[in-house]
Regions:
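Long, charge-rich low-complexity segments
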Residues: 87-91
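Histidine-centered nuclease catalytic patch
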Residues: 6-38
Length: 91
């Protein structure tokens, strides 16, 4: 059986992944989540900047749910045109 294919798109923003890939737990590990999904580093930092682990566990464990928050919707609109390895400080 061949190894699984490398991920190609970010779980959050759906842009192609670049060289650096981080793995996000949609349900945080501290809340017994085991599944991981590939994300850009900037997307990963933004998730954890905007949401607590409790919020991620209870209400925001899908990209669609995350995008319902206005701050995340603005981020997703802004990041959509950036290249895969785009990096900027997360404030």
């Amino acid at each position: 059986m061949p190894p699984p294919a490398a991920p190609t798109d970010c779980w959050l923003c759906a842009r192609p992944l670049g060289v650096r890939i981080e793995w996000h737990h949609p349900i945080p590990k501290s809340r017994k989540g085991r599944e991981t999904v590939p994300v850009h580093p900037i997307c990963h930092r933004t998730i954890h900047k905007l949401f607590t682990n409790k919020e991620l566990e209870r209400n925001f464990h899908t990209p669609e749910k995350l995008a319902e928050r206005p701050e995340m919707a603005r981020f997703l609109q802004w990041i959509a045109s950036k290249p895969p390895d785009f990096h900027a400080p997360t404030r």
